[in-house]
């Protein structure tokens, strides 16, 4: 009895991997053995970086808010503490967008944060 190799499915699978590896340099785009490895690494990097992207954006937002805070004469940590004391629940993404697009609106938030810090300090002295 003849050996069954399921050749059409094997060829389709290999062609699919080589299609994913299109644009890779040298043997990684030509030879199935190396293309498969390169594609698997690429998918692993893609998976990891989809998760890393979230922390990268958070860090970018913090840098932008910090720069705007320094221009307004307050440190980032004091600003965030003041927002919390003033019960202003804006996330860093929105704050960064305000800092870049609406400087006047951001300065209003800075003023509110500074006022909340003053009232917090005054209530701490009384207690």
Curated annotation (Swiss-Prot):
Q: Which UniProt keywords apply?
A: Ribonucleoprotein, Ribosomal protein, RNA-binding, rRNA-binding
- Organism of origin: Opitutus terrae (strain DSM 11246 / JCM 15787 / PB90-1)
Keyword Ribosomal protein attributed? yes
Pfam families reported in the protein's UniProt record: Ribosomal_L20
Under the heading SUPFAM superfamilies, the entry gives: Ribosomal protein L20
PANTHER family, alphabetized:
39S RIBOSOMAL PROTEIN L20 (PTHR10986)
NCBIfam families according to UniProt: rplT_bact (TIGR01032)
Annotated protein name in UniProt: Large ribosomal subunit protein bL20
The question of whether Kinase is a record keyword is answered with no
**Function as written in the Swiss-Prot or TrEMBL entry:** Binds directly to 23S ribosomal RNA and is necessary for the in vitro assembly process of the 50S ribosomal subunit. It is not involved in the protein synthesizing functions of that subunit.
GO CC aspect terms: ribonucleoprotein complex; ribosome
GO biological-process terms attached to the record: ribosomal large subunit assembly; translation
The record's InterPro entries line, in alphabetical order, gives: Ribosomal_bL20, RIBOSOMAL_L20_CS, Ribosomal_protein_bL20_C
Query: Could you say which protein family the record assigns here?
Result: Belongs to the bacterial ribosomal protein bL20 family.
Q: Name one GO molecular function term.
A: rRNA binding
């Amino acid at each position: 009895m003849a050996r069954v190799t399921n050749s059409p499915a094997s060829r389709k699978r290999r062609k699919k991997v080589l299609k994913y590896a299109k644009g890779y340099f040298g043997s990684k785009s030509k030879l199935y053995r190396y293309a498969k490895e390169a594609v698997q690494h690429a998918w692993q990097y893609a998976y990891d970086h989809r998760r890393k992207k979230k922390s990268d954006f958070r860090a970018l937002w913090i840098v932008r808010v910090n720069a705007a805070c320094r221009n307004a004469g307050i440190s980032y940590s004091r600003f965030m503490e003041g927002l919390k004391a003033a019960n202003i629940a804006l996330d860093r993404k929105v704050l960064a967008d305000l800092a870049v697009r609406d400087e006047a609106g951001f300065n209003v938030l800075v003023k509110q944060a500074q006022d909340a810090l003053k009232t917090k300090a005054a209530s701490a002295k009384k207690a």
